[in-house]
Each structure stands twice: as structure tokens, then as C-alpha cells.
Amino acid sequence: MAAAAATAVGPGAGSAGVAGPGGAGPCATVSVFPGARLLTIGDANGEIQRHAEQQALRLEVRAGPDAAGIALYSHEDVCVFKCSVSRETECSRVGRQSFIITLGCNSVLIQFATPHDFCSFYNILKTCRGHTLERSVFSERTEESSAVQYFQFYGYLSQQQNMMQDYVRTGTYQRAILQNHTDFKDKIVLDVGCGSGILSFFAAQAGARKIYAVEASTMAQHAEVLVKSNNLTDRIVVIPGKVEEVSLPEQVDIIISEPMGYMLFNERMLESYLHAKKYLKPSGNMFPTIGDVHLAPFTDEQLYMEQFTKANFWYQPSFHGVDLSALRGAAVDEYFRQPVVDTFDIRILMAKSVKYTVNFLEAKEGDLHRIEIPFKFHMLHSGLVHGLAFWFDVAFIGSIMTVWLSTAPTEPLTHWYQVRCLFQSPLFAKAGDTLSGTCLLIANKRQSYDISIVAQVDQTGSKSSNLLDLKNPFFRYTGTTPSPPPGSHYTSPSENMWNTGSTYNLSSGVAVAGMPTAYDLSSVIAGGSSVGHNNLIPLANTGIVNHTHSRMGSIMSTGIVQGNRVAGPWAGDLPPGLRTRSSYQWGPGRLRGHAGSSVPMTCPTGSSGAQGGGGSSSAHYAVNNQFTMGGPAISMASPMSIPTNTMHYGS
């Protein structure tokens, strides 16, 4: 897909004009490059003849579907050279900023004013000459239908908005770039898959001298508008096209991108990110620098029963008189092939996670075609293992500091959520047992992966496996608080509700023994545990989201504070006080689905819009409700389905 091939890049990019020679249609786009020079070379009669135009010329390129019309004009608007360049035309790049075209016995050498001008011209010409018909690295690994859907999806401003509004994602990127400003000051930067160009603007804020922003979807046109409106055309150059197919005029000092999908690898944009290293200087850096995929066994009887219950529709012996039961087995297989995208209570995990690391500075594209992750879990709890949970962290390792972006279930929720892969046959394991096996991801041409998981309890020999399609996930997130696993209370919740303080004075002056002086009902919802369920994604038209506990980019390194090692969240047994997090929302193949189906930003019809319960089907107000009992107003962590935003007791 050459999404923006008709959009010229560089100084003097013109507008649509009349048809040029060589098949450029009546609506062909005209690109103008001033300051070009022309040298004519021939060898008639066996002697080399040269003729150079003494003055700088204006080069106009009329881009058509099969050819490009090229014309050079003098200052007096006299055409001194004109030709058509198609797929059959003999032509080639010369040096950094020149191009040679051979017509019969003569050749013309066109020298551009800057390498940037030549790069823009060359990228336009490749598309016009039908180079999109050639099999680039991207085309070899991607079905055309998948690529069309993918780039169409990311060409929508609404999807760019969704990603930009992920506070954790966008804020962490900006913090990582600005905190490591020395890695960007006066440097050349490449932004792979720039989208709206937001990361390029961050690089400019950090002092980058030149940023090449490559974008294959039609979003490149919008990015160009933003660059111009922010007066950064001298520093940010938007290059329409795929990074596998465009050309850059120079090597770069650092590559930035946001290439992560569900389970880190979905959408296969990481391969484009690694491909871009052909433009990276030997001492260059990449932001992000490394990626860690974490996986851990989980127990969730409710989720498991949900999938089986859906498949039981096909168990009916008489659906409008038709026996559907022959398809019940196929339905079970299909539902269990879907990775589940949502979030969960940390207490469903049964062992410390296993980590698989990809160093983007060292990895090659081929390394991501087949990813094998062996695992051996030492079980911390007894129960049924229903599958494996996945999440990822990426690190921006700069000269000044390392900043982490995490999608862990203990951190503020992002539009990547977490992903869970179910077993059709759960495994029973006891605390102290080991669960070993392999997770194998095989890349497919649908910009995703086929997942094969095999797991075995070593002590009993019981084994389970499953095949899953990462391209077809089940988006389960509803905006409600994830439920803790059954049996999470080790003291009486009812007693804890009243035994959390000394005396509570109602506004009427009545003193109730055993009640606290400032009682927060959110502690009741937590069930006596210190797990604070603040990991909701705000639905449409909700109140202000409280990000007090999730400062952007504040995860400097996993399990390390200011250089001193501390026990990370997965060291040893899982403490009952592990917290969950704050908020956010999304849609396809990460979506950034980088396409697929999307999660609506409004509460699904018929589902509760209230955290932790409430029967309302409308979108809830996340943190606006105030609850008072004769004292100061208490902010409710859990929204309630009430007609007003304030409740008062004893008034």
C-alpha cells in the first residue's frame, strides 16, 4: 500500500495540476523542487559530450498511476527538458542527491538542491513507476487484504486520538525523550510509523536537529498539516510510505517508534522497527530499547465457564427445528482459540512470571518470525490452572536515565490491557509443584501470530495444550473492577467493616462505638484486603480520572529505586496487599489491531456502568461522586448508580 504516494514531501510541494507527459492523468499531483541543475551527457560519434545548464532550474513532477511526467523550467518559465519516466525507463540514483535518466543515446543527470529534495523525489518516483508491484520485505510477509485494512484503520484521526489519549503511553514517551534530552539534542531522528507525528514533536521539543517521520497510511497528510501549523517544517520531514520501501537522505542517530501490539508482538510492526536499523548509525540508539514479555499461570473459573457457556448455544438439538449439536465441538475450539483481552485481579496469578526479553538494538527481523518461550513455573498456590496470562514492559535506555512503560496488571491500565490464553482442559497443580512447557509464536501473513501452548505439571504428568489466533482476540474489558478470585478473604469482611477504627460521630451527635473517625467505604469494597481497584478505563462522558498514583513515566526500572535493588512485585510469594491500578481504554489489533475490531468507548448495552456493581446500563461517573456521613466529603473510588453526585447522611 502506497497510502500517501501522491502527496509530495519537501520544499515547494505543489498542488494538483494538468496532465503531464507520459500518462500522468488530468488530476495528477504536481510536486515542485526548486534549485535543480541539469547536465546532458552523450557519446555520439564515440566521443563523450557534456552540456550543463548554467542557471538553477525548477523541476516539476506530475505523478500518475503508471508514470511520472518530469519537466525542468528556467526562471523565464521556458521548458528546457521534458520526459516521461515509467517502469521501462532506464534510470538510477547517483550519489546522495542526483538522478540519471537515459533516453536513447543520451542521458540527463538531474542534481537536486538538497538530499532531502532528492529523497522526496525518489520516493514519489518509485510509486509512479509501479514499484508497489514489487515484493518488498513488507509485501513478502503481509497479505494485501490485511495491509489494506491495517493502513486504512490507522488513517483515521479517531484511532490516532485513542492512542494519544492513552495517558500512560503518551506521557511516558514524552518523559523518556525529554529526560534523555542529550540523546536528541542536535541529532538526526527517525520516527517509524509516526501516525499523527506526536513522537516527532517530542523529539523536536528535546532539541533534535532533523526528524524524518515515516508513515504509510493517509495519516501522513494530517501529520504534514500539524508540522506546518506548528512551524516545524525546517526540522520535521514527513515521508509518506513504508519504512521498508522509502529512502532517507542520511543515516540517523536514534530511531523512535511505538511499534508494540497486544502481547508486544501483535501486528508485526516490531519487524518494521528493526528493519529501520539500516538507517541507524553504528553508535545509534533506539527508543524503546528493549521489550520484556511476561507470562504467568492463572486461575479463573468464571472466564473458563463463560467461554464454554457461549459454545453451548451450538449444543441445542432443536433450534427452530434444526439440530445444531454437530457443531458444538467446533464452536468450543473456536472460542478457546481466542486470546482474551482485558484486565484482571493480580491475585488470580499462581506463580511468579517468566520473562522473555528482546533487545531491539541486537535483534534481527527474522528473530521475530518464530518466537519460542520456554517456561517453568514454581507454583505458589494450589488450584486449577486455566491458562497463561501475558503482558509486557518496554524500557527506554538513555544516556541520563532509563524509563519503563509497563502494561503489568499492577500498573495503570493502558490500551494494551493484558492478554490471557486459556487451556481447553485446565490442569490441577499444588503449591510447590512445577508447571513447565513452551509457548510458541509463529508469525503469519495477517500481521499477527499463531500461538501454540503446551504445559505439563511435572509431579503428576498431566498435560494440556491449546492453539490460539492472536489476530482474532476476544475483547472482554467492560470498565468494571476485576473480581478477586474466590477465597481471597482471610478475615471476616463484615467484621472488618466495623472494626477499622474507634468512634464515629454522626452529624446528629450520636456516637457509635467501633466505627472509625473517617470511614472510607472503598475499604469495604476491597474486602479487608489492601488491593485497591483503581484500574478502570474511563468510559465516554465520565468524570475526571484520578491519576494521582500513576505519574507518567514514573517507572524508572523494574524493582529498582534510585539504583538500590528492592524486592520486585514478583519476588517470592504474592503478598495479599498487591495493588491493581488506574485507567484507560481501546480498540483493534492492539489494537495498534497496530487493526481489527475495537472496544467501544461507551459502556456496552446491558452491562453495568458502575464499578463493582450497580444495575445501570448507562456510562458511569468515575470519581465525581461525593459521600459524606456528617463529616468532610469522602471521594468515592467506586462510582454508584445514583441520580445525583452527592449523598449526605445525618443532615
UniProtKB/Swiss-Prot annotation:
Ranges for region Interaction with C9orf72: 28-139
UniProt binding sites for S-adenosyl-L-methionine: 160, 169, 193, 215, 244, 272
Enzymatic reactions: L-arginyl-[protein] + 2 S-adenosyl-L-methionine = N(omega),N(omega)-dimethyl-L-arginyl-[protein] + 2 S-adenosyl-L-homocysteine + 2 H(+)
Residues where Dimethylated arginine is found: 551
Cross-link (Glycyl lysine isopeptide (Lys-Gly) (interchain with G-Cter in ubiquitin)): 228
Domain SAM-dependent MTase PRMT-type: 147-454
Key word DNA-binding present: no
GO BP terms: cell population proliferation; chromatin remodeling; endochondral bone morphogenesis; estrogen receptor signaling pathway; methylation; mRNA processing; negative regulation of dendrite development; nuclear receptor-mediated steroid hormone signaling pathway
A GO cellular component entry from the record: RNA polymerase II transcription regulator complex
EC number: 2.1.1.319
Family: Belongs to the class I-like SAM-binding methyltransferase superfamily. Protein arginine N-methyltransferase family.
Protein's name according to its UniProt entry: Histone-arginine methyltransferase CARM1
Species: Rattus norvegicus (Rat)
